[in-house]
Amino acid sequence: TKDFVAALLKNTPVFENGGRAATTTFSQRNIGDVLVTFENEANYVSKKLTQDQFEIVYPSYTILSEAPVAVVDSVVDKKGTRSAAEAYLQNLWSEPAQELAANLYLRPRNAEVLAKHKADFPEIETFNPNEKFGPWEEIMKKFFADGGLFDQLSSKK
């Protein structure tokens, strides 16, 4: 698979600094043949930006990508926003919040909401990166640090 990834990187005309920038480059500047991105970005491009001009292809399995959410004591105490931050956190996984997430192309974690939107979110096998590759510190060092696997494979460009 290293050869496949090296070939993929070799054929990448632009390395953007973030997901939305890559989406814009692909969908509005028409640079590139394929956009490898998060599910919500793919749906955003297909449904909002280009009215289904692009086909979304799901891999047979993919990484479980979970965004961390936390109340940062020093920040909320300084700004006086603790109650709002805690209320947000408590309601984030509620059915209405998950419904809103689904409407914004984010895969709901609530099983009932996910079932309601199953046409938009096909079943896909996921894996936990920590179980497969170790702690984040090791993952970052191995794959993304200076001289790491990403640098090695992209230098073959």
Region spans (language model):
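Ligand-binding pocket segment of bilobal, Venus flytrap-like solute-binding proteins
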Residues: 1-59
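A generic structural signal for short, solvent-exposed coil/turn residues
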Residues: 48-49, 61, 118-121
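Small-molecule pocket liners
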Residues: 65-69
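Solvent-exposed, acidic/flexible segments
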Residues: 15-19, 35, 59-62, 78-85, ...
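Charged, low-complexity, helix-prone segments enriched in Lys/Glu/Asp/Gln
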Residues: 5-8, 64, 140-146
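Extracellular/periplasmic juxtamembrane helices and adjacent flexible linkers that interface
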Residues: 74-157
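Sequence-level detector for tyrosine residue identity
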Residues: 44, 54, 58-61, 88, ...
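Weak global preference for isoleucine
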Residues: 31, 56, 63, 124, ...
